[in-house]
Amino acid sequence: ADTNLENEPFSGGRQMSNHFTSDNFDDHGNPLALAHQKNISTDMAPTAAQMPRTIGLALASKLFRNSEALKQFADLSTNGDEVCFCTIGDASTSEGHFWEAINAAGVLQIPLAVFVWDDGYGISVPKEYQTTKGSISAALRGMQKRPDTNGIDIYNVKGWNYAELCEVFEAGIEKIRRTHIPAVFHVEEITQPQGHSTSGSHERYKSPERLEWEREWDCIKHMRNWLIESSI
């Protein structure tokens, strides 16, 4: 924790998990021009606790787009073109907050992009023991947006395929920003070099075959190769 407000403006070191956040007000209490900066809403430690907040943040953009009374606040929104980005691990999608938020997003039609990082495990528990069909995107298919209905868009992409990630994210976010149709990006085959945490070894619950696969398809290694091959 850092008690320097310039380094940790959210709590001055009082929030010991020290999640990142950005200021909404300057040192004199005046609102900042949020529409002209990237804004981070501080994360929370309880699993899936970020989900309800994302609904409010995304709904704000919809209100700014649709309400003439809010057009005067040009420093807070650019005609509702903002997108709320939310990340969550695949195991946390089993929490009720996740389902309530996704359902609300589908009903409200708000600019929300939810990225599910899926490494196949909830700490040490394989996802087939906690997620229907062993896949959150498969479980959500009934919420897929169809013509003349509300709902969400669902995208599937592999975590080690960075070229495809860029293409899917770019097209998907552009659609969310333009149409305010929310989307879930299910990013599968994520790898963890040291398992869930350094407090225990994933060698205790992953098979030798799985560990060998993770070494071969390590997302960091594949990103490095992609950067070199693309001369980035």
For the regions a language model picked out, list residue spans one by one:
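Short, ordered loop/turn segments at secondary-structure junctions
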Residues: 117-120, 159-160, 188-190
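Conserved thiamine diphosphate
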Residues: 62, 76-80, 133-171, 215-232
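Active-site cavity-forming subdomains of large catalytic enzyme subunits
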Residues: 100, 104, 114-120, 167, ...
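Structured core elements
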Residues: 87, 113-115, 156, 184-186
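Glycine/aspartate-rich loop-and-adjacent alpha/beta segment that forms the canonical ThDP
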Residues: 175-232
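Short beta-alpha connecting loops at secondary-structure transitions
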Residues: 119-127, 150-158, 203-212
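Short acidic, glycine/serine/threonine-rich loops at helix termini
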Residues: 96-100, 124-129, 167, 194-200
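Cofactor-binding active-site loop characterized by glycine-rich and histidine/acidic residues
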Residues: 1-108, 115, 126-143, 149
